[in-house]
Structures are given as structure tokens and as C-alpha cells.
């Protein structure tokens, strides 16, 4: 992930905070409900967010969904509630604790297994005693005999990273959580529930330091799984890390855009305008000299009825178009400019004046 991408992530998180999106009534509850519904959907559940909300808050089940699907959601909700309280104690993460976490994830849907090496229960979070593969004909995960020692080593490394992490470095904490997700799902300690438990652990590590948890939507499933596969095949953790960072950036953008659209009408007290002004003031300090000049040129263009596009700015500043495009992306992330019109004949306009 480039330094620019890191800045984009931080700026979007700041904008999210400045707009007060997470301060809305019951935001955290519904945000977690969304995470749960999509996490189970990735594993085959067809329960929608609305159905999950009715199930969680009112105990209303859907006749369109199987009991198995609905129990998947109720179990994962219980696991999140347990984990969110526990993680704030900042205790070491151990193999026994991961087993207890997995037991909550699979409480009512886990199966009993009988193997040559003994029986075990997914509902109790017990480690697998059989070998598993990634789908029919897919690559096999590590031998089950290696799982206990590998899981213990993972816990030791995770706790070291947690204790040495810079709590003020948001990117570093997200990195840690994505690393933990990948490592746990790669070890694949259980016969079932590995994906849900890995995503849960990822979110808990983020919440431990008050970061906005990352959602993996059902629409992200193909890209998400492909990132896991590519990382494994190339033995390059940066592939998964970058993919998850970009996923979070995309969802932050979408949430911000949706929030702004829903507050465009009926805002008589000026709250939205005040929030946007605060955002503009905060980000203006982080602009480069060239970016400030670009803002001035776009402003002048509007006053002189000149269509300012990438080619125009490239010629004016005597820099290549790729450089201009990076600057424009930077300004767009800060919601200072926007593109108006078609790709070929459109132009840039100012959203907020930089003071």
C-alpha cells in the first residue's frame, strides 16, 4: 500500500468522524448487525440485514429462511457481544480463548465428528482432528497434527505484536488485524466456522483500539476469497493486506457519500454545512503547494468560464498527466473538488473553498 493510500485511509476516517456518522443513534448496534449478516452470508446464509435486525431485536424469525441460517446469525451475534466485552480487558489471546470464541460462533450449528484419532465437536470449538481442503479439489490446509502448536505460536506472535503496536498509528492497527485474520484462516484450526471466527478476531482487534471495524460484504466475497488465494499462492501477505485496506477505503467512501446524500434535504440548522466546513479546514493544511495551485486554477476556471480538465492542468503546471491525476485523487478524497459531466467533455469544479 502506498503512502498516498495510507493518507487516503486516514483522511476518510477523519472525515467519517468529523461528519458524526458514528455518533448517530444506535449506529454501533446496526453497524455490528450489518457485519454479522454479511459474514454469515459469505458462508451461505440468505438472512438479510433487515431480517437479522428483526431477529436480534424482536425475536421475529423469517419463514423464508432455514432455522440453520438464523441460528448462524444468532450465534455470531452472541460471539461478537462476548468478544467486544472481553477484548477491552486487553488480556493475552490464548488457544483456549480462541476455542471459547469459536464455540460461541458455532454454538447451535456445529457438528460432532468421529475420526480415527477420536471425536471432537465444532459446537464446542474443539480443534479439528481431520484434514481439510479449500473446496473440492482445492489445496489442503496444514495437517491437523500441526494445528495445536501452530495455533499456540500464532497466539504468541499476535500478543507480541499487540503489545508493541503503536496505538496512535491507525494504519498499523488495521495491518495487525488483517495479518491476524489471514494467519488464523490459514491455520484453519476448526472443521467449520474458520472464516467467521477469523473475521470476528479481525474486528475485535480493531475495536480493541477504538477503530471502525471493517465490513466484508457478501458482494465482496469473490474479491475477498481471491485475495486469500493469491496471498497463499504467492506467499505474499501484502496482497491480502492491500486488498482489505482498499476494501475498507471503498466502504468508507460509500458510507460518507450515502450520509451526505441523505442529509442534503431538510437540513435547516446548518449542521451538515458546519461539518463539511470543518472537514475542509482540517484537510486544507495537508495540501501540497501544487495541489493548492490546482485548486486556485479550478476556481479561476469557473470564474472565467474555462473548462478545467487534466490536460489543461498538465499544460499549465508543466507536469505529466499521471501526476495531475494523483493530485486530483488526493483532492477528491478531501471532498474539495468534483468531476462534472462526461469523461470526455467534463471538467473539475470546487466543492469547498480552501482558505
Regions found by a protein language model. Name each.
Residues 1-192, 196-355:
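FIC/Doc superfamily catalytic core
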Amino acid at each position: 500500500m502506498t503512502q498516498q493510500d495510507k493518507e487516503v485511509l486516514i483522511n476518510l476516517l477523519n472525515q467519517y468522524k468529523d461528519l458524526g456518522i458514528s455518533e448517530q443513534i444506535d449506529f454501533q448496534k446496526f453497524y455490528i448487525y450489518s457485519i454479522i449478516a454479511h459474514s454469515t452470508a459469505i458462508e451461505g446464509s440468505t438472512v438479510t440485514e433487515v431480517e437479522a435486525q428483526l431477529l436480534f431485536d424482536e425475536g421475529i424469525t423469517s419463514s423464508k429462511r432455514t432455522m440453520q441460517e438464523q441460528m448462524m446469525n444468532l450465534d455470531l451475534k452472541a460471539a461478537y457481544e462476548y468478544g467486544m466485552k472481553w477484548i477491552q480487558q486487553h488480556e493475552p489471546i490464548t488457544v483456549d480463548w480462541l476455542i471459547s470464541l469459536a464455540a460461541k460462533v458455532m454454538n447451535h450449528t456445529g457438528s460432532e465428528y468421529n475420526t480415527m484419532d477420536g471425536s471432537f465437536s465444532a459446537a464446542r470449538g474443539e480443534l479439528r482432528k481431520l484434514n481439510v481442503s479449500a473446496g473440492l479439489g482445492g489445496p489442503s490446509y496444514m495437517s491437523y497434527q500441526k494445528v495445536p502448536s501452530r495455533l499456540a505460536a500464532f497466539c504468541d506472535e499476535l500478543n507480541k505484536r499487540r503489545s508493541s503496536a503503536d496505538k496512535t498509528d491507525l494504519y498499523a492497527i488495521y495491518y495487525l488485524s488483517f495479518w491476524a485474520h489471514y494467519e488464523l484462516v490459514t491455520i484453519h484450526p476448526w472443521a467449520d466456522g474458520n472464516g467467521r471466527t477469523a473475521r470476528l478476531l479481525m474486528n475485535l482487534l480493531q475495536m480493541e483500539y477504538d477503530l471502525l471495524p471493517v465490513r466484508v460484504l457478501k458482494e465482496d466475497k469473490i474479491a475477498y476469497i481471491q485475495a486469500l488465494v493469491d496471498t497463499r499462492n504467492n506467499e505474499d501477505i501484502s496482497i491480502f493486506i492491500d486488498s482489505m485496506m482498499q476494501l475498507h477505503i471503498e466502504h468508507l467512501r460509500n458510507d460518507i457519500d450515502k450520509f451526505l446524500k441523505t442529509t442534503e434535504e431538510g437540513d435547516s440548522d446548518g449542521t451538515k454545512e458546519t461539518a463539511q466546513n470543518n472537514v475542509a479546514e482540517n484537510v486544507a493544511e495537508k495540501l501540497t503547494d501544487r495541489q493548492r495551485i490546482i485548486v486556485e486554477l479550478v476556481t479561476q476556471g469557473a470564474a472565467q468560464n474555462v473548462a478545467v480538465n487534466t490536460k489543461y492542468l498538465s499544460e499549465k503546471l508543466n507536469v505529466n498527466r499521471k501526476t495531475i491525476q494523483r493530485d486530483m485523487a488526493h483532492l477528491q478524497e478531501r471532498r474539495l473538488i468534483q468531476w462534472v459531466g462526461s469523461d470526455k467533455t467534463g471538467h473539475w469544479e470546487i466543492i469547498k473553498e480552501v482558505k
